[in-house]
Amino acid sequence: MLEKDIEAYLVKRVKSVGGRAYKFVSPSNRGVSDRIVCLPDGTTHFIELKRPGGKVSPLQDMFAREMALLNQSYDILWSKEEVDKWISDHTSTTPQIFCSPATAP
C-alpha cells in the first residue's frame, strides 16, 4: 500500500465524520505533517502518514517533538486500519447537532 492511498483514505474518513483534512505544505519548513485535521468537536490534529515500512525523517521527528512541546496533537498513521482506529479514538459515537446561536433551543 502506498502513502498516497492511506492519505486519501484519511481524507475520506475525516469527511465522513464531519471534519476536514487540509493538506499542509510549508516550503520553508520541511518536515511538517502531511495533514492538519480539524474535527467537529473543535480539536485540531497534525497527522503524518507513512506506508508500512516507511521511515520518519529526522526533520519529521523534530517537527513531532516541537508539536509535543507546544501541547499539540500529533500522530503518525501507518495503515488504513490505523486511520480507522484514530478516527474511532478521536470522534464521538453520539451524533452532534450544530446550529447557529439564532436557532439554538
Regions found by a protein language model. Name each.
Residues 1-105:
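Catalytic phosphate/metal-binding cores of nucleic-acid and nucleotide-processing enzymes, i.e., regions
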